[in-house]
Amino acid sequence: MMEERAAAAVAAAASSCRPLGSGAGPGPTGAAPVSAPAPGPGPAGKGGGGGGSPGPTAGPEPLSLPGILHFIQHEWARFEAEKARWEAERAELQAQVAFLQGERKGQENLKTDLVRRIKMLEYALKQERAKYHKLKFGTDLNQGEKKADVSEQVSNGPVESVTLENSPLVWKEGRQLLRQYLEEVGYTDTILDMRSKRVRSLLGRSLELNGAVEPSEGAPRAPPGPAGLSGGESLLVKQIEEQIKRNAAGKDGKERLGGSVLGQIPFLQNCEDEDSDEDDELDSVQHKKQRVKLPSKALVPEMEDEDEEDDSEDAINEFDFLGSGEDGEGAPDPRRCTVDGSPHELESRRVKLQGILADLRDVDGLPPKVTGPPPGTPQPRPHEDVFIMDTIGGGEVSLGDLADLTVTNDNDLSCDLSDSKDAFKKTWNPKFTLRSHYDGIRSLAFHHSQSALLTASEDGTLKLWNLQKAVTAKKNAALDVEPIHAFRAHRGPVLAVAMGSNSEYCYSGGADACIHSWKIPDLSMDPYDGYDPSVLSHVLEGHGDAVWGLAFSPTSQRLASCSADGTVRIWDPSSSSPACLCTFPTASEHGVPTSVAFTSTEPAHIVASFRSGDTVLYDMEVGSALLTLESRGSSGPTQINQVVSHPNQPLTITAHDDRGIRFLDNRTGKPVHSMVAHLDAVTCLAVDPNGAFLMSGSHDCSLRLWSLDNKTCVQEITAHRKKHEEAIHAVACHPSKALIASAGADALAKVFV
């Protein structure tokens, strides 16, 4: 009985825990379920463990806690899925927005860069136009003025010349440009008066000559025909004079149109302009014009007083500084080639006047007339070249001649250097670039008579260059030269080189403490010839450390060397042994020597510089120091990198680490001059054989040429690049040719002409 009640309770509990719509009948565990009434109306559910489905007429099931929980879980899962899809779409849209923003920013940067490039090109174009304008006309172009460029106008049909001809803006700009030219060349009122008198003399004064009465401004003007030519020409003279004065003085009347003036000049109807040759910017502008003869009776000039003519010529000749050089002292005066009053002179004056007026028209910016000549005019004269202001002083002075002015061209590699004393006044340009070394070049030496150079490098080699065997790499580029011989014997960097007597031998010193004597091979040798062991003559041994400086005296046939071991030695290079003649121990008193040189005025004296800033003069015959030069500056001792001697004077020049160059008197030891020469340490010096100029090199990558007369810099050349905070190591001047050379830490040597 108890078991049946427990089974019924379990069945009731199980039925209450089923979800909505399940109508299975409970039964004992392990037994077949018995039929139970369905929760809702309708037929009873069938047994077998499965609940019977409600019938077609079943109504809504009542809510239960499990059903509510199931619904909430289902809705929560659907919400999470939609949220995940929304997050994915949001991330995708954000990525797309970021991509579009990046594209927009990139386009803005590109636009900014293009605008910057356009402005840069516009600026470069303005600079080129100003340069071309200055070369062509000799005056600086005013960037504020806008010039009408007809050639740049693109149109599908023919350009109407009437539009530009009647434009007041073109007239105004042309007058302003002419006024600027006249003011810049000193074309004052006095010169204008002289020019007015000359125009009168060329045209003829109609009032006095022809006896005609000049019409007033209100009276109608006579046409430029045979009947009314006298009055018209006198009025033309007056209008031309007023126009010239207005252009120069800058009055308010300069803005008026001058069409009425040019309309009465019949010989301007057939002017034809030809463009100048664009291939040569320095050619003067040539205008070929066809002239039309005027009746000679209206152009008979009045015979002016000779004194007035001379005064005019003297006044105008004061401004004869624009000549191209063709009208020298021996050039004939075209105004005095014929007898006064002859038909040839009248014709020449008439042609000059026509050229003046035609060129005034060209400067004003007017296009040439395209209409034919008026009926009844004679045949035009053959064209001839006439420039503006042709009649100033009767010479060939013109704005076109300003184009003949020359400027220094950096790409022009040729320079007339026949006079070595005046060579420093010229511009030195790079011509040869020597590129065969693999490390910095420490020293240079020129051949005494040939165009050959010897270089010593830290790569352990010396190389001989024949500068006459140059190969052009490209147009307007420095010439490349290949070495004809490489000297190899040093065990380490080669630090110094010196050329022997007559350039038969050369000497090199290196970090291996050895001095090698070399025989110079034939300069015409083939670089690919076999090795000649006789090139190495012998070795001078005696130093205990690196040899930093060498100097050879052709007078005494002695070789001087300075070493890091603290000694200065004098050698007889022609002797096999013992080659060392004397030794000057300097380490205890002055320190380590850095450079040595022979004095030109006293062949038995040498001068040595030291790291301590001292400069000592030695006597080879006595074997002792003569004088210690006062080479230390006021700021304290600084290392001296090189010492050289003036070729004609008892003067020693030193290059210091404190950017200075000092000039010392060998007789007194006092400093003669001191100057700050570079922006960095001065490393090397060279004096030309005539003593006219000094060349200095520095770690600021610049070469500077100094006039020894006034100690001023006449030229600066940037030739080398820095490497390990070092730039230029050595400079040299050719003893007999107009050549200079420099060597640097960039493993390049450059030759200048």
UniProtKB/Swiss-Prot annotation:
GO terms for biological process: negative regulation of hippo signaling; regulation of modification of postsynaptic structure; regulation of signal transduction. Residues 71-79 are annotated as: Caveolin-binding. WD repeats lie at residues 436-475, 489-528, 542-581, 587-628, 635-674, 677-716, 723-753. Residues 271-283, 302-317 have a biased composition (Acidic residues). GO terms for cellular component: cytoplasm; dendrite; dendritic spine; FAR/SIN/STRIPAK complex; GABA-ergic synapse; glutamatergic synapse. It is found in: Cytoplasm. Its main location: cytoplasm. It comes from the Eukaryota. Belongs to the WD repeat striatin family. The name 'Zinedin' probably originates from the name of the famous soccer player from Marseille (Zinedine Zidane). This is Striatin-4. It comes from Homo sapiens. The lineage of its organism: Eukaryota, Metazoa, Chordata, Craniata, Vertebrata. The gene is STRN4.
